[in-house]
Each structure stands twice: as C-alpha cells, then as structure tokens.
Amino acid sequence: MEDEIKSFEKDRNLIIEDSKNSKNNIVDVQKLIEALKDEKNAKNIVVDFTEYNPLHNGHKYCMDFGKSEGLFISVIPGPLERSGRGIPYLVNRHIRAEMALLAGADLVVEGPPMGIMGSGQYMQCLIKIFSALNGDIIPRGYIEEETMERVINSINNGNHIKIKPYNISCIETREKLGEKLEIDNYVIASMSYTIYKLKENFPKWNPKFKFIERIEGISGTKIREGVFNNNFESIKHMLPITTIDVFKNFGDNLSEIILKRNEEMVLDTVNNFDLNKYLPENISEKLNEKEYYESIEEIKEYIPRGFSKNNIERTISKLEARIEKETISKYIENYPANLRILNGINNHE
C-alpha cells in the first residue's frame, strides 16, 4: 500500500503540473506516431478509449476490428487510477497497458483521470486527446437497440448527435431519433456531440466512427471477482490468454497489485480541509453539517440524495485526490498538456 500511496501522490502532482501547462511534447509524440505508422505501412491512425479493467474478449474483439483499419492506439485512463465509476481500478494503468500491447495494440497512451471528473469533462478530454493523436478512425462497440440504429445511420451520414433527457436527436436534420440509450451506446452519442461542440477548436480534424456490435456473455464484475479469488478457471472463457498470463506472472503476489482506496486520505480531507475548494457547493455544504467523520460510509450517507452511486464514488475520489476545482478546470482547459506513452509496464514521457 505504501508504494501505491507514493504513486497516487506522484499522479496528483502530475495533474497539478499539467494544469499549469509548463511544457508540451505533443509535436514530438505526433512525429513518433507518424514514424510508427510508416513503419507498419498503416493507412489510418485508429484511436480507441477503453479502461481495460481488465482487458477481456470484448475489448480484444473491438481491437481486432479497429486494427483492420490502421495503426491502433489505445488510450487508457489515467492518473490516480480511479475509474469512471469513481472506484479504484483492479490494477494500475501500466499493467493494463501491458495487457493492451500483448492483445495487439500498436501503442498505448495515457488518458485523463476519469475518477475525479464528470462525464462531460472527461469526454471533452477524450476528444481533445483523440485530436492531438491525429486519430482518423474511432472504433466503437455498440449494443443493438432501435434508437442506436438510428444514431449510427445519422453518424454514418456525416451528422452529429445531440443528447438531452428523453430526446436523442440529429443536430443537422433536427430529427428526433429516440428518447433513451443504453449507457454504452450513450457514450457513442456523447462522443459525437462533443466532437461537434469542439469542432471550432479542430477545424481540420474530421474523424470517422466505425461501429461493430458488441459480443455477449462477458461480465466485468464476474471477471474481477475471479481475479480477486485467483480463480481463473471460472473466467478463462471471457479473457484472452494474454490477459490471464499477465495476472499469472505475478504468482503468489497477485493480491499485492490489486488497487485499494486510501481511506485515511479521504477522512483527513473531509475532517481537516476546506471542502468548498474540492467539491460542488451543494455537496460541501451538506458534508460540513457533520463535524467529524469516522468512516467512508458515514461520508456517503451525508452526500445529498439524488446522486448516483457513481457520482458518490467520484465524490470520494475527489476527497482522496484533494485537487482544487480550479486546478481541475485548468487541467481540462490545457488538456492534453503532454502525451504520455505507456510502453508495457514502463511510463515514458
């Protein structure tokens, strides 16, 4: 846990430093990518964002589909090692990058710190990094549903999607496409919408989506349970052999690589710091009603009702990170301040 705390603090400082935009290596990395593209005689640069928590057969299926279009770059979040659900990833991004490379990715790049951002914030970061990587193709797996078929047709016709509660529509034609989308399909619509919103920032960038229906029979929850229990026999049908090998290479030390929450940091923040600097006003005011917290569960009980489980966990991650809201805003504004390549289990800037 001590090494994990040190890594967390290093990531925290990295985010703060990037918010200042003190240096920028984007052009150098773009040259590296172009050289790799030429070396592999690839027609396009394919960019995909996936958490790989861990990398399973569904990810491998989409990766193989994307690789058929060109040089495949996996963008993996990211500093602090907290997922979009606000909880610690199973293993750190360097191990997840190794899984991606062994599964067939040509390059793995570090993405944004999802666990301390709202969905709109990290989606904005994703589109910015896709553009910085000069991505030509964005492959996405989708779940079949009627509204999604209309969304795909609209995007394939060169249009963009607008998302509002109970109103999924085409921006260009103003046609209503449906009322709701399954959460993973919603991500695709949100990507399209964010590309439209940021188009003035990247007037020469016009990426194309490539869609493939997701395969069934894979449960991330069951996979993580199998890893926790060191029971790979029960989950081997859902994982590429390369992912299983990465885990098995740790042998009896497997439990040591499983990431955990730094609860002491969370409690120290909530009990001793000005919460207005880190949290939305309505949440900080509610938490300030109690003078002292003794557990994470107590904190969760005081977070206002109406927030999703993921939002609650992201609040805990914000307390854990202890990075001021203003710093996060500057980080997003400057993103990506740098492009960091994750090469196997080593991090090279």
UniProtKB/Swiss-Prot annotation:
This is Uncharacterized protein MMP1471. SUPFAM superfamilies: Nucleotidylyl transferase (SSF52374). Belongs to the TmcAL family. It comes from Methanococcus maripaludis (strain DSM 14266 / JCM 13030 / NBRC 101832 / S2 / LL). It comes from the Archaea. InterPro entries: HIGH_NTase1_ass (IPR032266), Rossmann-like_a/b/a_fold (IPR014729), tRNA(Met)_cyd_acetate_ligase (IPR008513).
